[in-house]
Amino acid sequence: MKIKGLVDEDFVNFKLPCMFISIGTCNWKCCIEANIPVTVCQNSDLAKQKDIDTPIDEIFNRYISNPISEAIVIGGLEPMMQFEDVYNLIKYFRSKGVNDTFVIYTGYYPNEIQDKIEKLKTFKNIICKFGRYVPNQEKHFDDVLEVNLVSDNQYGEVIS
């Protein structure tokens, strides 16, 4: 799986302590639609980092070896651009009997990725954070993720 980084214990992206996986691909839709430079994106520096090829079983073993993390968050750049990797990661965890929550931070809206959402519904405990980054908005508390999100159009939704 091509990633940009992995944090074994993250406490800011979900209500539970989680493993955070940074995906390595983006089409910069948020910046393009807002007509702002890509450098404004909080993930622009992440995009410049070298890709790390990480086997799914290695991610799994790191997760289950950590007594603190209770969920997995997959985020920026854009996870839906590596959907097969994301799907296969979740499938691997489920095949090993781990049904902990997966949270996918995407800049897409449900109507743009309905086919992918339908595939994700085949798994238990999936949450998506939907919505593009829009500059100059006030952050707000999301009741599903139980964390602050930076744009008021962004929201968490339980998929399954």
Where are these regions (language model features)?
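Flexible, charged surface loops at secondary-structure boundaries
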Residues: 14-15, 64-68, 121-123
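Structural preference for beta-strand elements that scaffold enzyme active sites
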Residues: 18-20, 71-73, 101-103, 127
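A cross-domain feature marking catalytic cores of carbohydrate-active enzymes
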Residues: 23, 76, 104-106, 132
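Canonical radical SAM enzyme core domain
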Residues: 44-61, 80-122
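Conserved glycine-rich "GG(E/T)P / GGGxP" loop and the immediately following alpha-helix
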Residues: 68-96, 130-134, 138-159
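Short, hydrophobic/π-rich interface segment
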Residues: 117-137
